[in-house]
Amino acid sequence: MENMGLKIFGDVFRQKRILITGNTGFKGSWLSLWLHDLGAEVTGLALAPDTEPSHFDLIGLKDIVNHIECDIRDSRVVNKAFKTADPEIVFHLAAQALVRDSYENPKDTFDTNIGGTVNILEAVRASSSVNAAVVVTSDKCYENREWIWGYRENDPMGGHDPYSASKGATEIVCSAYRRSFFNKTGLGPHVGFSTVRA
């Protein structure tokens, strides 16, 4: 049965080379499957799944996308993966995403979420093929005010715990890259670039 919801995208992603970091995670595996179904050539870059069974394994993603197992903290492996995939579009979802783990291993959280993102952004900057990049962070990037309404784009960055602080810092890093490198007047090639909170 054809998924009618995907029809609205037409051929936008057909035959596009797309690199997705964190494709073994829940959101990344769904995004990989969805883009594959839209005709994209998907390359995933991620650690091995950390649950058994994993969504990645249950949907057979390793059989339908190119998967490169790597830690985004290793810039050499990230750069090699970018050269292999030659992506036109990058979705960066890889992260240490657990607040509790951030208390137990704050350095790993900061190294992955900030340093790993810098490695991805540097690979985008060095690439001649990337036209667009999206970095996925979290609503935890905002200062926690405990109010009744949702956060807004112009709310201050913050974070009382290492995970939240790492996501706020990632937003600031992305803003610096957007302004310095990924615009028509910056020092690098024009790349359509955005962050989203999911």
Language model features by range: what are they?
Residues 1-197:
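N-terminal Rossmann-like NAD(P)+-binding domain of SDR-like oxidoreductases, especially those catalyzing
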